[in-house]
Amino acid sequence: MKNYPVVIIGGGASGLMLSSLLPSSSLLIEKMNQCGLKILITGNGQANITHDEEPREFITHYFDKKSFVSHAVYSFPPQKIREYFREKGVETTVRTDGRIFPSSFRSRDILSALMKTNGEIITGTPVLRVKKDGNLFITETEKESFSSPVLVIATGGRTYQKTGSTGDGYTFASSLGHTIITPRPALSPIRINCDTTPVEGISVPSVTLTLGKKEITDSIVFTRNGFSGPTAENISHWIDGKTELTVSFLESFEAQKIKEENGKGSVINTLSKLTSLPHSLLEFLFPFLRNKNNASVTREEMRKIEDTLLSWRVTADTSRTEDKAMVTKGGVDTSEINSRTFESKLVPGLYFTGELIDVDGECGGYNLSFAFASAFLAAEDIRKRI
């Protein structure tokens, strides 16, 4: 059995960041044949690594985990993340919406920078189990076992499983006594109770989705069975099972304006002109208007038009979206983790970083930022003990 001062399980964003910040005596074990597969698809392959905001604003994008992430974000804010990558040879750029990317807009450049580590990396090696033996952790793989006084579990969540995020870390954490908050998809496409194939691929730049008291406005893209895009993905955090969702395409609209247009004109064409919504989307929403002219629209039809454009009610859920969701909500209970060091409060020498923890952020680089920041604090604490 080989002994290392530190063993890291997981070669994703947080595991690689941690490895790069530790001495060369550390060992990182990755189950896939290549590290960082999920990094490569982040931000549509462009790697939105963080967001240009001050920490006090930044932490508001983590839903109910603002307090838990605060020290990490203040310790390793966006500016320090940019400096880290600059030192690794990767310049970054701020988009007009505040999202920060490598200047090349190539996620592979981010992965290459993270791979510049002095630590040892083993790939293609799934971990079977972990256990505590006195003051040491034993990490068992099919071929061999490793012992270490410090163990970091950085295996990610349970989404995009083809990248290796299959939820193994939950089993490891649970076997060491930790509570797992039920994992489910977040930053996920939303499925709705109607076939949206006819409008698949149509993008609407500003739509408001309302779920109870939660309201988010941004763009959406229609999929075969619902929506994706920032608005859908951000509100998916609160969807648990089948839930009524209200879709508002416009802030206000008076259907009576149709009657002010040429009476012989097509209602669909008129609506597209008045609302700036795509013709094909309006045909999908109002099939009963396809062959009607403006003059023939009834009072009841005008009411339906207003109701649908201002508050289209659908039944939404995020089931069966694990392979499309970008992150996982749920994971290791934050109440059992020291938010200043990311060490377990239950098991000395055990650390958790990144998406494995019950923390998820909004779209815009917040999840990668947390992966990096949690690794930064864990590395600071680990260096003091090895």
Regions found by a protein language model. Give the residues of each.
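An anion/pyrophosphate-binding glycine-rich loop and adjacent beta-alpha core
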Residues: N33-C35, L40-I41, I49-H51, P55-F58, ...
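Short hydrophobic core segments
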Residues: V7-I9, I29, V127, F146-K162, ...
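A conserved short coil-to-beta-strand element within the FAD-binding core of flavoproteins
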Residues: T123-L136
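Glycine-rich loop(s) and the adjacent beta-strand/alpha-helix scaffold that form part
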Residues: V150-T196
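Glycine-rich FAD pyrophosphate-binding loop
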Residues: V7-I9, P23-N44
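Conserved N-terminal/central alpha/beta ligand/cofactor-binding core
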Residues: N33-E120
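Beta1/beta-strand and adjacent pyrophosphate-binding region of the FAD-binding site
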Residues: K2-G12
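A glycine-rich dinucleotide-binding beta-alpha-beta segment and adjacent secondary-structure elements
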Residues: T123, E283-D360
